[in-house]
Structure formats: structure tokens, C-alpha cells
From Swiss-Prot:
One of its GO terms (molecular function) is RNA binding. Its EC number is 2.1.1.182. InterPro entries: KsgA/Erm, rRNA_Ade_diMease-like_C, rRNA_Ade_Mease_Trfase_CS, rRNA_Ade_methylase_Trfase_N, rRNA_adenine_dimethylase, SAM-dependent_MTases_sf. Its main location: cytoplasm. It is found in: Cytoplasm. The keyword RNA-binding applies. It comes from the Bacteria. S-adenosyl-L-methionine binds at N35, V37, G62, E83, D113, N136. It catalyses: adenosine(1518)/adenosine(1519) in 16S rRNA + 4 S-adenosyl-L-methionine = N(6)-dimethyladenosine(1518)/N(6)-dimethyladenosine(1519) in 16S rRNA + 4 S-adenosyl-L-homocysteine + 4 H(+). Disulfide bonds: none annotated. This is Ribosomal RNA small subunit methyltransferase A. The gene is rsmA. Belongs to the class I-like SAM-binding methyltransferase superfamily. rRNA adenine N(6)-methyltransferase family. RsmA subfamily.
Length: 307
């Protein structure tokens, strides 16, 4: 049990959400994948699972009408909310001022597409201090947002996100399972992920057609021996690019053997160097094995000349 989150009574319920939306002339849109959480217990659960305390600096993507925002601020944390929809970004500070006025100084709102966010345009996260992402992500772009932020922010140390249940299962999938795929392996390059709970449809407005789940992620520390390759070093990203290229090729032709799927990238000797049987399929490889194969390709020269 986490005792760091006091129940202040300042969180949004269904009536609050609908009133705020009506006052601001806002309706949920499919374009931005908007489904607003209307249950205070759910947002407190998300924050509790994330382990947010007053010492944390939090990024939220897609704050919507502010349900989760207020739950994060309730802990005493400082946060930046990244919202793509201008009317919602404009409304959010007013909602915080109304329901939790003492927290307004701890909130920064950035009206921007999360896929375009960089340390340069979100200066609160531009230093080396670790931060956490806590979000109810738009289901149609959840995976691209996570991988983009992990690539651009070396100091994104952890996240707790709510996504479509099927997406959560894929993100946390392990080698050999039917749902293990590109998102699973690429996320494993950066750290470890697990599904930590499910969320029903009745806590949203409007109610989605799918169930949701929570995914918790912890990034590898720079000195963690489990970190594949140079995932958390200051390299120029070339090794990650090759590893991700291998992953895309292997899962783009999922039923083919590695030898067939990677024939334009990996020379035959690379498999021998890496100790990987080329008759295996990509769905059986761990991120460590993809990394070992990338290193072997580099030792053989230009992978584009594979025969």
C-alpha cells in the first residue's frame, strides 16, 4: 500500500468531466483517440502503480480534461502535460486552478504532438535528471509515442501507461509467444516491461469498444549488465538503428527463417559469429540475440553487402 497519496477529494468525477467539457465546448474526438477517465479511483490507482511521490518530475501525454493530471498533482509532484488538442491544452490550467489551486505552480502545459516532442522544445526535461511518464495514451499511437520518447529522452527512467489491452500484452510479451513482435523487442532494448493490471470500459467517457490495461516499464541503468549493447550509453545510435532494422526485417516476414528474412542484411558468417541458428525465426530471438547479431554484422563489414 502506498501512503504517499492523500485522498483530497479534488479529483474529477463523471459529472465534473461532462460539465467541464460542456463549458469549454469540447467533445471527445476519434481523431485524437480521446476517451476521458471519469473515475477518481482509477486515476489514483494509476498514480499508485507508478509510485509517484512529491520528489518526482512527471510527464503526462494526452491529459485531456485533467482527470489523471489532478491525481498526479495530488502527490505533490511537479509535472508537464503534453496535449495535442489546442482547446484541451488551453482549458487544463483552469481546471487545475478550480479543483486544486495550490498545485497550479507545479503544472506546465505544452500544446504539442507528443511525436514531435524533443528535449529542446520541452526544456523541463532537457537536463540529466530522471523523470517518469504517466499517461492514458491515445490507443492509436501509443507504441510510437513510447518508442519515440525513449529514443529522444535518455533520462526517461520509467513509465506507467494505460493502453488498449491487446497493445499492453504485446508490449510486455516474451520471446516465443504468438503476440511477441516488433513493439515487444524494441521496448526491451531500453528496459523491462510488465502488465500490472486491467481497466474496465465503464470508467471512460465515451466508453471505448475495447478493454484497457496498465503497463509498467523501468529503463536499464547505464551500468546494468542486462542492458543490450549500448542501449543506455552515449553512442550515436548507430547500433540501435541496426538492431531495429533487423527487428523490422525479421518480423516483417515473421514466418520466414532468419536466413531468408535477413538475407539482404546479415551475411551467413554473422550468424556463426553470434552463435545463432539461421533456421530460427525472429519471434524466438531475445533482444540480446538481436544485438549480438548486429554486432556480428558490424564485425563482418557492411550488412548491405550480405550474400
Amino acid at each position: 500500500m502506498n501512503d504517499t497519496i492523500p485522498a483530497t477529494g479534488h479529483l474529477l468525477g463523471a459529472a465534473d468531466i461532462r460539465r467541464i467539457a460542456a463549458d469549454a465546448g469540447i467533445s471527445p474526438t476519434k481523431k485524437f483517440g480521446q476517451n476521458f477517465v471519469i473515475d477518481p479511483g482509477t486515476v489514483r490507482r494509476i498514480v499508485r502503480e507508478a509510485g509517484v511521490t512529491a520528489a518526482n518530475h512527471v510527464m503526462e501525454v494526452g491529459p485531456g480534461l485533467g482527470s489523471l493530471t489532478l491525481a498526479i498533482l495530488e502527490t505533490g509532484a511537479t509535472m508537464t502535460a503534453v496535449e495535442i488538442d489546442p482547446p484541451l491544452a488551453e482549458r487544463l490550467p483552469g481546471t487545475v486552478a478550480e479543483f486544486m489551486p495550490e498545485a497550479t505552480s507545479r503544472l506546465t502545459v505544452v500544446n504539442r504532438d507528443a511525436l514531435t516532442v524533443t528535449p529542446e522544445n520541452v526544456p523541463d526535461f532537457s537536463d540529466d535528471a530522471s523523470f517518469t511518464l504517466v499517461a492514458n495514451l491515445p490507443y492509436n499511437v501509443a507504441t510510437p509515442i513510447l518508442l519515440t520518447l525513449l529514443e529522444r529522452f535518455d533520462n526517461l527512467g520509467s513509465f506507467l501507461v494505460m493502453v488498449q489491452k491487446e497493445v499492453a500484452d504485446r508490449l510486455a510479451a516474451k520471446p516465443g509467444s504468438k503476440i511477441y513482435g516488433t513493439p515487444s523487442v524494441k521496448l526491451a532494448w531500453y528496459g523491462t516491461a510488465e502488465r500490472v493490471g486491467t481497466i474496465g470500459r465503464n470508467v471512460f467517457w465515451p466508453a471505448p469498444n475495447v478493454d484497457s490495461a496498465l503497463v509498467k516499464f523501468t529503463r536499464y541503468q547505464a551500468d546494468d549488465p542486462a542492458a543490450p549493447g549500448t542501449a543506455n550509453s552515449t553512442d550515436d545510435g548507430t547500433q540501435r538503428e541496426l538492431v531495429f532494422r533487423l527487428i523490422d526485417a525479421a518480423f516483417g516476414q515473421r514466418r520466414k527463417t532468419l536466413h531468408a528474412a535477413l538475407k539482404t542484411i546479415a551475411p551467413s558468417e554473422a550468424f556463426s559469429i553470434a552463435g545463432i541458428d539461421p533456421t530460427r525465426r525472429g519471434e524466438t530471438l531475445t533482444i540480446a540475440e538481436f544485438t549480438a547479431l548486429a554486432k556480428a554484422i558490424e564485425s563482418c563489414g557492411d550488412g548491405d553487402e550480405a550474400q
